[in-house]
């Protein structure tokens, strides 16, 4: 594995921000644009999905009934491996219930394989590893 140039690193960071924004703003078209058509996503005990459409549909069904959510993606490392780029990023997600009261906070990391397409970088494979989850009680 080798380092990537600044432009590639920034493009990958922008992709991950679009992913988080797509979920948090319930912009399912934006979220879908982050994945290849044949993307494989493994979120551990949460589930696994094949294809950008399936991933997006699951996220829509999971998040539409809820209140606000905030996905923060940090500590990004990016390296090159042949024609693909690999990235690891930390995620800290807060998801609130429909009344923005009780919710959950989950922390973990994404291990991604990304490919360059005609319209920019996309996630081709993702593995989410949850490190911690806790219930958030209303104030």
Residue ranges and their predicted role:
Residues 86, 107-137:
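Short beta-strand edge/turn micro-motifs at domain boundaries
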């Amino acid at each position: 594995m080798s380092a990537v140039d600044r432009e590639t690193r920034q493009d990958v960071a922008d992709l991950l921000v679009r992913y988080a924004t797509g979920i948090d703003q319930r912009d399912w078209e934006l979220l879908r644009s982050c994945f290849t058509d044949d993307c494989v996503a493994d979120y551990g005990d949460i589930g696994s999905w094949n294809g950008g459409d399936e991933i997006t549909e699951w996220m829509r069904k999971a998040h539409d009934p809820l209140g606000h959510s905030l996905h923060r993606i940090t500590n990004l490392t990016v390296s090159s491996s042949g024609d693909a780029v690999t990235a690891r990023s930390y995620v800290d997600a807060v998801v609130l219930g429909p009344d923005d009261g009780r919710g959950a906070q989950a922390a973990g990391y994404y291990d991604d394989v990304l490919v360059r397409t005609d319209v920019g970088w996309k996630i081709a494979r993702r593995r989410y590893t949850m490190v911690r989850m806790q219930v958030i009680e209303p104030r």
